Amino acid sequence: MSAPSPHSALDIILERMAAAAGDRPMPQLLIVAKTQPADAIARVAESLRARAGNEGHVAIGENYVQEALAKQPALGGLGLEWHLIGHLQSNKARDAAAAFDWVQTVDRPKLVEALARHRASAQTPLNVLIQVNIDDEASKHGCRPEDIGALAADIAARPELCLRGLMAIPAPDPDMARRRAAFQRMRGLFDALVARHASVDTLSMGMSEDYALAIAEGATMVRVGSALFGARTANTPPPFPADPMSSEST
């Protein structure tokens, strides 16, 4: 059986998201566009915008700064909201601060300082999520839960940045009960951050294989790529050299 088209897949994803949310507000769908050409992104973005009840910006997630920069000229007229969801090295902060509306992978003070320094005063504040290494994986980036408070205070003190919440990628455990527990821990950390910072409203967690579970546990944004476009094949290399510790946010 062939995989559903992106348009059919989009309908399935939105239905599952709504069912998982129940009577809570519909979470935002972030379209993960890693390795996808600009024309494919445009078609899905237009389909999402056309769906009944889809209000606000269509959000596009990219893992690599260079890949986003290469695609943005062709997509500039669509009013897309660009999110960086891959690990950001400090030497790429200048380009990221200029090109993205959100950076979801802030995990250290040096990066906070660099993004604030390079965000132009003519731009609106850069929306920032703190990436949390919720399962304490050596192979993943992200701050420790106990470091969230200090990092959040640093971000909130900088007018060039806007603290919006938390992001996490739990360990890819086949036991969904353990993933649920990780999502629940993230929800607890998020609720604590909401109580301290009025700007916080976003909990980004859940990907193609577990977005419904993440929504059930309180995600306000899910990052979906392979469930929408189809799985990337093993012979499809990343468009840019991969960080060996880079997160796979699909």
Task: Describe the residue ranges of each PLM region.
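Active-site loop ensemble at the mouth of alpha/beta enzyme cores that anchors a bound cofactor
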Residues: 235-250
